[in-house]
């Protein structure tokens, strides 16, 4: 998924329809390339650790640590400075990289839930890192959505939603 996110972020046009440069897109691509690239390596580190029995982890292996978890939090704090506070849940929609980030977050949350079942066999910082990672993916998704000028799709609770699809179809037919 992370490779797909990088691919999709690189597909974003650097120019407006009028030919002008979109500087914000370069920033998004730069953040995606460096942050997602680092994340791919960190996930390989994490996978290597989880593939080993706890008492058989090689001494030379560099493990995910508190510094890695803290870095995710620092990056989230930086992006959050530009974001408006949440007023509703956000539905997973959006163009290429944004949709892929929503999917990556879902997969990460699933990983976190399954890791709870083996919590006694893993270091606490590993579960903390995965928890922060899912939050990090969410905040990055919101930040990229903002930077690209796209809209977030907010959840509308039952009772506050517009008519159903069938009702809208009936209205459209009546107006023809």
Please give the residue ranges for each predicted region.
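Phosphate/pyrophosphate-binding loop motifs in nucleotide- or prenyl diphosphate-using proteins
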Residues: 1-176
């Amino acid at each position: 998924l992370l490779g797909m996110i990088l691919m999709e972020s690189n597909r974003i046009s650097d120019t407006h329809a009028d030919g002008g440069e979109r500087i914000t897109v370069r920033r998004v691509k730069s953040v995606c390339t460096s942050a997602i690239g680092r994340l791919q390596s960190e996930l390989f580190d994490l996978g290597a650790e989880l593939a080993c029995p706890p008492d058989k982890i090689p001494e030379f292996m560099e493990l995910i640590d508190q510094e890695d978890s803290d870095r995710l939090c620092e990056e989230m704090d930086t992006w959050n400075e530009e974001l408006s506070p949440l007023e509703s849940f956000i539905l997973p929609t959006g163009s290429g990289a944004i949709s892929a980030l929503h999917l990556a977050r879902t997969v990460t949350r699933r990983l976190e839930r399954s890791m709870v079942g083996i919590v006694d066999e893993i270091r606490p910082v590993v579960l903390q890192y995965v928890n922060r990672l899912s939050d990090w993916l969410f905040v990055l998704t919101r930040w990229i959505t903002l930077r690209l000028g796209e809209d977030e799709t907010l959840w509308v609770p039952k009772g506050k939603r517009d008519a159903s699809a069938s009702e809208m179809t009936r209205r459209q037919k009546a107006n023809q």
